[in-house]
Structures are given as C-alpha cells and as structure tokens.
C-alpha cells in the first residue's frame, strides 16, 4: 500500500500540464528556478508551488548554489513509476512498440 500511496503523488504531479512542461524542460539538464519561471507566463510563486509538488513527488531534485536553487529531473523515479504502471495495465508488446516508436521519432527530430 505504501508504494501505491507514493505513486499517487507522482500521478497527481503529472496531472498538471505546467508541471509536465517543467519536467520536459528539465530533460535538457539542470535549470535554476528563475530560468524555469522565465519559460512560463505565470507568477514566480506559482512556479515555486509547482516545483514544490514535483519535489514532494520525488520527480525533481534541488541543490543550492550560492543564492540560486538548481533543479534536475529525477529520471529514475519517473521511469520506475511509469514503468510499473504500464507493466500493470498494458501488454508488454504495446509498451515496447510505443517506446520504440517514440525513441525513433525523437531521433529524427534531432
């Protein structure tokens, strides 16, 4: 049950489009809070709340560098939660086929 409760926080965090976009932005590497906020047309405090939710879900990690707070995507956590969910609800062939398709499309965009 603890894992289920833990994963609920991940899926709640992923339910918001702003938080999903933050995760996509962090895919490129570490970003300062101000850099993240500059990518959105919402207030700094709102971005801070979104980052707090993502951090509580274990999807981002933060570190301080002087007076800046830097955020990184915790890829392993995201992959583990989504992987467990997909394994539980989708036949393996569908997951593998979609993953291969997504990776191929991303490679062509580069």
Mark where each language-model region is:
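Amphipathic alpha-helical dimerization/coiled-coil segments
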Residues: 1-6, 27, 74-110
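N-terminal helix-turn-helix DNA-binding core of bacterial DNA-binding proteins
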Residues: 2-45, 67-78
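Intrinsically disordered, low-complexity regions of eukaryotic proteins
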Residues: 18, 64, 107-110
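Residue-level detector of secondary-structure transition/capping positions
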Residues: 30-31, 55, 86
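Alpha-helical residues within the helix-turn-helix
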Residues: 38, 49, 55-56
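Intrinsic disorder/low-complexity segments
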Residues: 43-45, 49, 107
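Beta-hairpin "wing" of winged helix-turn-helix
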Residues: 55-65, 72
């Amino acid at each position: 049950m603890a894992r289920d409760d833990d994963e609920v926080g991940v899926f709640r965090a992923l339910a918001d489009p702003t938080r999903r976009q933050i995760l996509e932005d962090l895919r490129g590497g570490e970003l300062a809070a101000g850099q993240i906020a500059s990518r959105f047309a919402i207030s700094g405090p709102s971005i801070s709340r979104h980052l707090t939710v993502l951090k509580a879900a274990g999807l981002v990690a933060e570190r301080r560098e002087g007076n800046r707070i830097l955020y990184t995507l915790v890829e392993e956590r995201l992959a583990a939660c989504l992987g467990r969910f997909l394994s539980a609800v989708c036949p393996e062939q569908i997951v593998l086929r979609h993953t291969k398709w997504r990776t191929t499309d991303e490679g062509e965009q580069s």
